[in-house]
Regions:
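Nucleotide-sugar donor-binding/catalytic module of glycosyltransferases
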Residues: 1-245
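C-terminal subregions of glycosyltransferases and related glycan-biosynthesis enzymes
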Residues: 123, 223-446
Length: 446
């Protein structure tokens, strides 16, 4: 391994050893030497991962942090992973996810021509681990592979103003499935109470800090990672009422305190038990009040996002319970002014359809193609359908904004959440931006 890794890939885990092990095996198939792997276990039984790692840890690229003598909150488990990292750039993924280590090569080429870039996001695919009795899903491999510069003002508007939201802000740029430069991380650590992660909802905590403190942002339409959803993950529970409630209960229990009792939330009557949008609203309200960061007029967009969150519940009884909870919160918030913007529609139990083939945006591929049973195995197939990382065009004169990059498709360019990555501020004629609802928050116990 090189003395100073280009990229540290951090993978924290808790009590999901079988998925953690498969993810580790998939990552280590890449022999790149300028990448460092930080694997942190936080499980009740330390022996499982300790035995698994006994020989693997001999790889000089690996830093393994075993379970300590007490269970850590997810926030503290992520914190120790960040402290253990040495790379010039850092990315976190979940223990049921995947990221392509060769993104390190793209990072090097980007910073050579645009040295002000401090955060890189990319398109990400979503994968549901196989479950008996459930149909295999599909992923869409995009045709576009542009790399563009993203204006900070657009990210601020999307994160804090809830501009054009899905059920989540369409800003991206967390350290989760995005790479953050060391200098930016250290500024965040110094300013925010000498911690990288201050809030239990670690991904959105960091995303807000990266957007507020970052100087230059870049986005690659070519995907470099895959969100995984195993039956024990929070993203798997989206749209399932009992799973959502149980995940929230475990999350609060392992955190050790109810973060919703924070003084900053006194007049914000939304609970994380309602779902991912309410959870994001809670952490964002804490950040707004604590650090005096705000954009006027965000409430209407937030109400629309809450409606989309509610619509993810396909069971009518679950939909009614969540809808009633949100309605009560909106009725008791700011005199009920924004209740009229919360208008969810029950979509019914829509049947799943197995789909594959070409669309205008890319190639749809079944997630079990070639017998794939893990994100890493599926990545082996779909990455062969995409341009190789070393062949992605990075202009020698520096990155340009979307409306300045003729090769970029505004229809395809996405940030996590499903909307365009942004422009220099000019309108883009004839480039529609269809929405997709793909929340992937790690608000849960790792």
């Amino acid at each position: 391994m090189t003395d100073k890794p280009t990229l540290s890939i951090c993978v924290p885990s808790r009590n999901r050893q079988i998925y953690f092990q498969k993810t580790i095996e998939g990552l280590l198939r890449n022999k790149r030497t300028d990448v460092e792997f930080i694997f942190t276990d936080n499980s009740d039984d330390p022996a499982i991962m300790n035995d698994f790692m006994a020989d693997i840890v001999k790889d000089p690229r690996i830093v393994y942090l075993p379970t300590t003598d007490k269970v850590l909150s997810m926030m503290d488990n992520w914190e120790r992973a960040a402290h253990a990292s040495q790379g010039e750039w850092v990315v976190f993924i979940g223990d049921d996810d995947f990221v392509e280590p060769d993104v390190a090569g793209l990072i090097l080429r980007i910073t050579e021509v645009s040295p002000d870039i401090e955060a890189l996001a990319w398109g990400a695919l979503s994968y549901f681990w196989p479950v008996d009795g459930e149909m295999a899903g599909s992923v869409t491999v995009p045709f576009d592979h542009s790399v563009i510069r993203v204006p900070k003002a657009d990210l601020m508007r999307r994160m804090f103003g809830w501009h054009e939201p899905t059920s989540v802000p369409t800003s991206g740029f967390s350290i989760y499935h995005s790479a953050v430069r060391r200098c930016l991380l250290e500024r965040i650590y110094t300013k925010y109470n000498h911690r990288y992660f201050e809030h239990a909802v670690v991904d959105y905590d960091m995303a807000m800090k990266v957007i507020v403190e970052g100087k230059g942002f870049a986005f690659s339409q070519r995907p470099f990672s895959m969100f995984g959803a195993c039956p024990q993950s929070n993203s798997f529970s989206i749209g399932r009422l009992e799973d959502t409630k149980e995940r929230a209960r475990i999350f609060m229990e392992e955190f050790g305190t109810n973060f919703e009792e924070n003084e900053a939330l006194r007049n914000f009557p939304f609970s994380s038990f309602l779902g991912c949008t309410a959870t994001i609203g809670v952490v964002q309200q804490w950040f707004r009040k604590t650090y005096k960061v705000d954009l006027a007029g965000w409430e209407k967009g937030y109400a629309k996002a809450c409606a989309l969150n509610t619509e993810s519940y396909r069971d009518k009884d679950a939909f009614d319970v969540i809808s009633a909870g949100y309605e009560t919160a909106f009725r008791n918030w700011q005199g009920g002014r924004f209740l009229k913007h919360y208008q969810p529609v029950w979509r019914g139990n829509m049947p799943m359809i197995e789909m594959s083939g070409a669309t205008s945006s890319g190639m749809m591929v079944r997630s079990d193609i070639a017998g794939a049973t893990t994100p890493a195995e599926l990545w082996n197939v779909v990455s062969a359908m995409m341009i190789a990382p070393q062949d992605i065009l990075v202009r020698p004169t520096g990155l340009r904004f979307l409306d300045e990059e003729a090769s970029a498709s505004g229809e395809l360019t996405r940030l996590p959440g499903g909307n365009p990555a942004g422009t220099s501020g000019k309108a883009i004629s004839g480039k529609p931006s269809p929405m997709r609802n793909a929340p992937n928050s790690r608000a849960g116990g790792r």
